[in-house]
Amino acid sequence: MTATRLPDGFAVQVDRRVRVLGDGSALLGGSPTRLLRLAPAARGLLCDGRLKVRDEVSAELARILLDATVAHPRPPSGPSHRDVTVVIPVRNNASGLRRLVTSLRGLRVIVVDDGSACPVESDDFVGAHCDIEVLHHPHSKGPAAARNTGLAACTTDFVAFLDSDVTPRRGWLESLLGHFCDPTVALVAPRIVSLVEGENPVARYEALHSSLDLGQREAPVLPHSTVSYVPSAAIVCRSSAIRDVGGFDETMHSGEDVDLCWRLIEAGARLRYEPIALVAHDHRTQLRDWIARKAFYGGSAAPLAVRHPDKTAPLVISGGALMAWILMSIGTGLGRLASLVIAVLTGRRIARAMRCAETSFLDVLAVATRGLWAAALQLASAICRHYWPLALLAAILSRRCRRVVLIAAVVDGVVDWLRRREGADDDAEPIGPLTYLVLKRVDDLAYGAGLWYGVVRERNIGALKPQIRT
């Protein structure tokens, strides 16, 4: 078996949202959407959308399906928890640390105290049902440095990084470790959910729309895809892979987790997001702290753009879709007609690309419509989040622009509320659409302010440059 070959017994399952075209000659889906044509031999290996690796041919097909993002792994049991060391960076959060350690029974744990005012000591964990080692930084070096210190002391094949304000749910580790049956997987992340029920509107909003919660759909981690990164609040990594890329960048005060993900991908590793595994996070729910945190996240975009100029575009859109919506927003009869012409030409181009896959007119129409709608949602989000200072200026100067911005703000908020409400826990306290819409706009204003501040600080506009595809 080669170093990257999937092992026998490993299975993949075609995503339920992927469309099977014709008699199974092609698959349409993935993120971004693509058309994958299948040879007759490949079709014969798939059984109800599932493929089990038995030999070199099936292993190669499974890898193709995974890399095309049209299928997800169904691995056999993975490494043991004894192969994992948990690294916890902490600073001035003794209560959260105790809560976390209590949930880590039977695991080896390294606590890295990053210059706490009241230093963490080994005696603080008397009676804990895990093997704990405490390391100290005499003064704070930041979470990235604390994680690297823990990584340097780790002797196991795998390392789990958990922040001190999280608490894993039962079965989290086993659900993640299975993915490492794929020898190319370097990092797997769980879904981050809320630790406590909503005590105020901000808490209820965070339970539905936390920046750390990447949703309920499993996915590969790839730039410009559904899941473009995973937060380091909770991740499990292959120790050797993290060391090979130099660990976390200690010069970054925010966005170091995004940077690590992208450096691993650039090195040829594969990353997975596994929402079956749940880790609860103690969200900031006081309004001032919450706004400051959103701005802090926005401030990471510009430093990331300096390091990864091809991965930080706030808007990735086709030129045709962009032009169609610009013309539509003009609001004149001629503009709407031109927009319709562009939409028809887009449909014809899609039809030509799909002509070898036994597709119907409805298939082409569905793909074109979904593409234009996705582009509209991207534009609405970007107007309200990344480009809101420009949108505000345009709205002040132009009545027509004011109408466009208002429509974008409402559509973006309502659609996002509807989507996220579907994935909410049944016992979660609901948040109404109006409250959600207001907080979503505050969220975007804070993030955008941090983004623009970072752009000025770094003197780099890469985080604002859209990526327009032909």
Swiss-Prot record:
Coiled coil: none annotated. SUPFAM superfamilies: Nucleotide-diphospho-sugar transferases. The keyword Cell membrane applies. GO terms for molecular function: glycosyltransferase activity. The keyword rRNA-binding does not apply. GO terms for cellular component: cytosol; plasma membrane. It is an enzyme of class 2 (transferase). Its EC number is 2.4.1.-. It is a single-pass membrane protein. InterPro entries: Glyco_trans_2-like (IPR001173), MftF (IPR023981), Nucleotide-diphossugar_trans (IPR029044). The chain crosses the membrane at residues 315-335. Keywords: Cell membrane, Glycosyltransferase, Membrane, Transferase, Transmembrane, Transmembrane helix. It comes from the Bacteria. Its main location: membrane. It is found in: Cell membrane. Belongs to the glycosyltransferase 2 family. Involved in the biosynthesis of the enzyme cofactor mycofactocin (MFT). Acts as a glycosyltransferase that catalyzes the oligoglycosylation of pre-mycofactocin (PMFT), adding up to nine beta-1,4-linked glucose residues. This is Pre-mycofactocin glycosyltransferase. It comes from Mycobacterium tuberculosis (strain ATCC 25618 / H37Rv).
